[in-house]
């Protein structure tokens, strides 16, 4: 992040706006809505500001200094906005405010600002702020317009009523997890629908009954085994997104991308359970035991795995353990690396003219060899997808050639598929190992073998910056 988003309490505090035009008038109106006392400094005022002055000055909320800006105007200010049409004046205001360590915003000049103003979706007490860091105000405005259509106006009333009952709910339920689950059920159920329909009294009566009838039973834990997909956050399923937001704790793998981890709730504890070749941070048996222990503590456990949990993800072993302990679980499929990486590389895994079948195998080296059914893999008219095949690539290609595939059979390797770091190298079984070594590829990678690889040249649509020079 280039800027830290914060919400500043300026209620009954003095804020200074320098400028007397329409832009200044909009800034004054926003500050007044936030409860500030505003002092406007300008030689002249536009009609809109004059109207605001007539309305607000009697209440002591708005004051006017018919002067050019002087440093003394900042004497008791907690925030300053420079909205004049004179760059030199705006620069002087910025320098004075920074010297006094007062937050300053200069309209349309991020370089002079110590803070910038976001676009705001106001559903008080719910407020959503959107910013591009000054890079594209138009994009920010478009995002705000979209959010305005997605968030009903009644969300403000919904939040206000929840605030009225907050202390009672806290007193009713001693455990934070119980309170959170109560509110999740209430805010997604009949209470919310009644508020949206304008039936506020009925909604409050319903909530009263729920509080009276709710029992403080021990919280039951459960485990969500969720596929995070190959890396691009936009490939997550809606169900995965929902469970990511309601989990009490997350146990995640090495292949879950940082961008996806950023979509978790900030307050959710995270436990890393990644595995790398010859270095397992946590053995599989320990992971199984950890899931059981966390669930028995009453937690909703998100087991987040790269790709799909049932395709070389050892998800079956984990839920067997959970089932053996009587722990509830659910499985959310993810887009597996084969589907995601191949699609983003422009390589269809099946094609009427080239491949009538597709085989997924794992290419882990063990004692210098890869233990696979080579005669089956060397059949024509099929596509072979090899997970975790980077280190064993030379053995893989030699064995396929030795068992009957032509040495010029098309083959490709995809690094970090579906992400901005994706790199694709298309070659043949004979040349791919040497080209891969020269390119210094790193895991995670996916190897694809078969005639469909030739379609990559025509169908490659995803071209992130920094792709391999000369790669196809």
UniProtKB/Swiss-Prot annotation:
One of its GO terms (molecular function) is uroporphyrin-III C-methyltransferase activity. Then it catalyzes the NAD-dependent ring dehydrogenation of precorrin-2 to yield sirohydrochlorin. Finally, it catalyzes the ferrochelation of sirohydrochlorin to yield siroheme. The gene is cysG. Residues 1-207 are annotated as: Precorrin-2 dehydrogenase /sirohydrochlorin ferrochelatase. It comes from Nitrosospira multiformis (strain ATCC 25196 / NCIMB 11849 / C 71). This is Siroheme synthase. Its EC number is 2.1.1.107, 1.3.1.76, 4.99.1.4. GO terms for biological process: cobalamin biosynthetic process; methylation; siroheme biosynthetic process. The active site is at 253 (proton acceptor), 275 (proton donor). S-adenosyl-L-methionine binds at residues 230, 306-308, 311, 336-337, 388, 417.
């Amino acid at each position: 992040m280039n800027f830290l988003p914060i919400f500043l309490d300026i209620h009954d505090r003095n804020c200074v706006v320098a400028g007397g035009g329409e832009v200044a008038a909009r800034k004054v109106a926003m500050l007044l809505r936030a409860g500030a006392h505003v002092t406007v400094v300008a030689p002249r005022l536009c009609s809109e500001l004059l109207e605001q002055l007539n309305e607000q000055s009697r209440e002591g909320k708005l004051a006017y200094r018919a002067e050019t800006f002087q440093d003394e105007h900042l004497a008791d200010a907690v925030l300053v906005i420079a909205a004049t049409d004179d760059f030199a004046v705006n620069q002087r205001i910025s320098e004075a405010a920074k010297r006094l360590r007062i937050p300053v915003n200069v309209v349309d000049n991020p370089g002079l600002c110590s803070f910038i103003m976001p676009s705001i979706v106001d559903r008080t007490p719910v407020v959503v702020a959107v910013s591009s860091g000054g890079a594209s105000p138009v994009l920010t405005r478009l995002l705000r317009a979209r959010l305005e259509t997605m968030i009903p106006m009644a969300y403000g009333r919904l939040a206000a009523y929840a605030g009225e009952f907050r202390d009672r709910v806290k007193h009713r339920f001693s455990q934070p997890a119980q309170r959170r689950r109560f509110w999740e059920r209430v805010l997604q159920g009949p209470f919310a629908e009644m508020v949206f329909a304008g039936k506020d009294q009925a909604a409050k009566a319903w909530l009263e009954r729920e509080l009276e009838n709710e029992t403080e039973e021990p919280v039951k834990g459960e485990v969500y085994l969720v596929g995070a997909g190959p890396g691009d956050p936009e490939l997550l399923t809606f169900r995965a997104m929902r469970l990511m937001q309601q989990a009490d704790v997350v146990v995640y793998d090495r292949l879950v991308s940082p961008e996806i981890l950023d979509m978790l709730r900030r307050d959710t504890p995270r436990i890393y359970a990644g595995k790398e070749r010859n270095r397992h941070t946590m053995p599989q048996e320990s992971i199984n035991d950890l899931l059981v222990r966390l669930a028995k503590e009453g937690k909703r456990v998100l087991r987040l795995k790269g790709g799909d949990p049932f395709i070389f993800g050892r998800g079956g072993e984990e839920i067997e353990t959970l089932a053996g302990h009587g722990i509830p679980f659910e499985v959310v499929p993810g887009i597996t690396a084969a589907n995601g990486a191949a699609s983003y590389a422009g390589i269809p895994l099946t094609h009427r003219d080239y491949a009538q079948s597709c085989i997924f195998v794992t290419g882990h080296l063990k004692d210098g060899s890869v233990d696979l059914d080579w005669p089956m893999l060397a059949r024509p008219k099929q596509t072979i997808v090899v997970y975790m095949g980077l280190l064993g690539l030379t053995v893989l290609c030699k064995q396929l050639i030795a068992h009957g595939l032509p040495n010029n059979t098309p083959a490709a390797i995809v690094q970090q598929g579906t992400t901005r770091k994706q790199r694709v190298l298309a070659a043949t079984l004979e040349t791919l190992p040497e080209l891969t070594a020269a390119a210094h590829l790193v895991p995670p990678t996916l190897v694809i073998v078969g005639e469909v690889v030739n379609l990559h040249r025509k169908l490659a649509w995803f071209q992130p910056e920094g792709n391999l020079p000369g790669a196809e």
